[in-house]
Swiss-Prot record:
Protein name as catalogued: Chaperone protein DnaJ
Annotated cofactor note: Binds 2 Zn(2+) ions per monomer.
Cofactors (names): Zn(2+)
Domain of life: Bacteria
The organism's taxonomic lineage, starting at the top: Bacteria, Pseudomonadati, Pseudomonadota, Gammaproteobacteria, Enterobacterales
ZnF segments: CR-type: 137-215
Subcellular location: Cytoplasm
Pfam family membership, one: DnaJ_CXXCXGXG
Organism: Buchnera aphidicola subsp. Baizongia pistaciae (strain Bp)
Keyword Metal-binding among UniProt keywords: yes
Amino acid sequence: MSKQDYYKTLGVTQSSDEREIKRAYKKLAMKYHPDRNPGNKNSEEKFKTIKEAYEILIDPKKRTAYDQYGHSAFEQGNSTGNNNTFTHSFSSNSDFSDIFGDVFGDIFGGTRKQKSERQGSDLRYDMTLTLEEAVRGTIKEIKIPTLQKCPTCYGYGTKTGTKPQFCPTCRGNGQIQMRKGFFTVQQTCPQCHGEGNFIRDPCRRCHGNGRIEISKTLSVKVPPGVDTNDKIRLNNEGEAGENGAMAGNLYVQINVKKHPIFEREENNLYCEVPISFSMAALGGEIEVPTLDGKVKLKIPCETQSGKLLRIRGRGVKSIRNNNRQGDLLCRIIVETPVNLNDLQKDLLYKLGESFNGFKGEKNSPKSKRFFEGVKRFFDDLTR
């Protein structure tokens, strides 16, 4: 029984281009696929014929041989005199993933299974800032080692003027089918490692990798208000992708150094302010530091050690809302005088006596409560 002309099988002509052949195959394959026509032997045979025609006409070498010698170009032991004869076997054991992979992928770019595009890896860079830099914002230059798209082969890994070779083992699918008893098992093609093609002539600069190692310098704009563990994302500044895929991102991890004066808690700053016991008792005014210079801080009379005094708007601007700014909280530390001379000691002794001794109820209410508590504690023990 003579075979039908492959062009007529697909409903195309000898002048039809690759795109028209793919569209025709897609339409017919979806119509006659065995999964859509279970138990229909005619559809199964029709699908097998359609697939056979497509696999010949989509391959430039096989199509040329068919145009010259017809079906005899693919028969074993043919006598056409052509040394470049083809042998080919066809199978109807194709599922819809074959059609979508071979046809839809081809129509929307590429020939059969292209070498996988893989997005580049993300990178991390640890940046240390002073508190002033973190609060005000800054611009830092950093140098990072990374992988960049090879400028010679544009990331494809092939020698100039060449292209990846179509894998003959899997016919560009990246998978091969092996029969084991009643089952058909798919496995990764051992020749192209699942890529569908392979590089016969690799680029000399990148040795076929498509990427080269470089060290690049970047300027990083740090916004005001960042804090330790914040991250700044630089899009597409990570490693270059493979086979034309997008590059990864670079994440700059912020670490703020400990400051000799200020401690930060979210948008508020804290500092310790030592004052004399006389100022703590009588009140007064003292200069305290801020990140923007010195300011006056009013000390109320009878201020106790550990009291927090707030200076509004002298903290850190919010990174999310620049109209909001934290406060500076001054923790008062009342210093006990040291290195006293005899006169000072005498004056302090007299001052203490004026308080009705060092347990004066009126002048030292906390001391009074403390010693009363101590007395009750020991009384309870002796009962």
